[in-house]
Amino acid sequence: FVSSQPQYSALWRVIESEVVPLSKKEGIGQIVWSPMAQGILTGKYLPGKKAPAGSRATDKKSGADFISRWMSEEVLTAVQKMKPIADGLDISMSQLALAWVLQNSNVSSAIMGATKPSQVKENVKASGIKLSADVMQAIDNALGKLPERDPKKNESPNPRA
């Protein structure tokens, strides 16, 4: 089995236009990381509120610099528009984010981080969730133009430069 390990989430879609089509053609699956956009898609970060103490967004060792791109009021407000979608399906925001990623036929698996066993139990349930085309469209509508899609952002820096 050959796979690629790119970043991929409802907010970070840079692999969709070039990597995914080529991978499908060549029989390469995706084992994606950051399917919940560093926790942003869990809904725990709220517009107008400070990030919870001890969260990834407040801890430099856990990637506070990396997550900062998603900590704008615009992004957090859009993500909260996904809550009624999750509620309507009787699933958590985390499960919705993971199910969205796993809906891509080229995604073989998703690497998720968890700080508690309960998070693992909750997130594993996403593997059995199938989202309808209407739900997928509702997620796209909620996020609007926010998802990053520029394939140039998928390039690795040249180590010899």
What residue spans do the PLM features occupy?
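Glycine/proline-rich, positively charged
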Residues: F1-E18
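Structural preference for beta-strand elements that scaffold enzyme active sites
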Residues: F1-Q5, G29-I31, S108-I111
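Conserved, mostly hydrophobic/aromatic
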Residues: S4, S23, Q30-W33, M82, ...
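Active-site beta-loop-alpha junctions enriched in small/polar residues
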Residues: Q7-L11, P35-A37, T115
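Aromatic-lined glycan-binding groove of carbohydrate-active enzymes
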Residues: I15-A57, S92
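Terminal-tail/helix-coil boundary detector
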Residues: K25, K49-L89, Q103-S108, T115-A161
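Conserved active-site loop/cleft motifs that coordinate metal ions or position small ligands
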Residues: S94-A97, S109-G113
